[in-house]
Amino acid sequence: PRSSSAASDVYKRQGYKNATWWESRFWLGSYDDKFDINDLGYLRRNDMTWSGMMFKIRRLEPIGYLLGSSFEIKLNKKWGIDDILIEDELSIETWTLLKNYWRFGLNSFIKRPAYNDEDIFRDDNAWVYETEKFWYNGFWIKSDRRRKLILSIDAGMGNAELRGKGYYSEFEIDYKPIDPLNLSLEFKRDISPNYMQYVDIIEDGSEIVRVYANSKQTTDQIQLRLDWTFSPDLTFQG
């Protein structure tokens, strides 16, 4: 922890990792309203408290068709100004490695109703509003990484009652014709609906009208990447 007469921040983390099959962690952190966010080297709001816990079960010894597997559950909570709950998320992640070195996994999370206070930093007359419950379920699969040609797929769907459904999909091809050279081609599509996005505040005489709107962000991306290692000290990327 670090503190001074002007501002203070606290961060604690405690955990245990069993060498064979399980591990757990707990963390708690806080910034007061005088904490200088520039002290961290990047933009992060102050006057915030967060905590969470994680529990993971893993198997690293081969059995049957499996070389290894893992199951992790995690809980995150954040509180903002006046101890308002601004994040309440529960997530689950799994992965499995097969004997043919293909691997696959599942990831799922649910954001339970909390509050969003980000708009009051833009305008003092904006609202702190209640967020809706949102869930996301996804899966991924990746072929043998020892091969010259590696295929991977990542996809998922999220949903909330008011904002509706969103989708994510990604397909990637990695090709390694020779050891120093790696080529990668990635196709990605992301459809993300947003709810209660702040627009503006209109003053009409003595009346204040707060304008919010739904929106939907669609991202289509194709990316080609090249990595060529000439020596341990010289690499070309493009």
Where are these regions (language model features)?
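Extracellular loop and loop/strand-boundary signature of outer-membrane beta-barrel proteins
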Residues: 38-43, 78-79, 123-127, 156-159, ...
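Transmembrane beta-strands of outer-membrane beta-barrel pores
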Residues: 28-34, 57-59, 73-81, 108-114, ...
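Repeated loop/turn-to-beta-strand initiation elements of outer-membrane beta-barrel proteins
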Residues: 20-26, 62-66, 100-106, 147-153, ...
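Residues on the lipid-exposed face of transmembrane beta-strands in outer-membrane beta-barrel proteins
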Residues: 13-17, 53-57, 92-96, 139-143, ...
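Single conserved hydrophobic/aromatic residue that forms the stacking wall/gate
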Residues: 1-7, 11
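Flexible, solvent-exposed coil segments and beta strand-coil junctions
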Residues: 30-37, 69-75, 116-121, 147-153, ...
